[in-house]
């Protein structure tokens, strides 16, 4: 390879570090949008990837090279079975952070939930929760999705929290109280044509080398000892390998949001 006048940009992005396995098959939502609305609404839904497809469309963006031409892209089909609202959780904030104050569960839970946990029916749970609404800062719906309703053979359900925004705490609790023990469909959460953020876990690939994992360049075919390896691990000082050096490790099974 000839001499370069300028150095080449690094191969592989550092924006997704650490590239480790996700802790769960369920995506973790750390921040929910702040919706300014008079009526409360759920902000999330769950689905399963069903298939991939090709989408042919006409480019309607003006001042682009492909304006008026046909574009072919990839699309993903997501099946969204009904989501059961099995509980309500209230959080309160203090100087140390956010803590769970109460949990209210529906009386008749799906039998598949016994694979995860068991709850005792508490008739006064709703009354006690209503009395403590003054110290509640956030309310979440405890939702469950049964894979069998999506045509999957998995018996273990997925249980997660969905944020509720809009109105005050009293309106949000009344909204969740009305949905408790019922099923919610996706058209009750999202409208047709809206843009949403999708968080999911990618397909796991196992342990991969630096060539595949980071996309670094291979060495010449007659190089000593190795070809699909790095030429250097860094400078002699400091006497450590920096985190930015591409190394072998886990590839896939990461959480990504689009």
Please provide the spans of the model-predicted regions:
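Extended basic (Lys/Arg/His-rich) segments that typically form rRNA-contacting surfaces
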Residues: 1-258
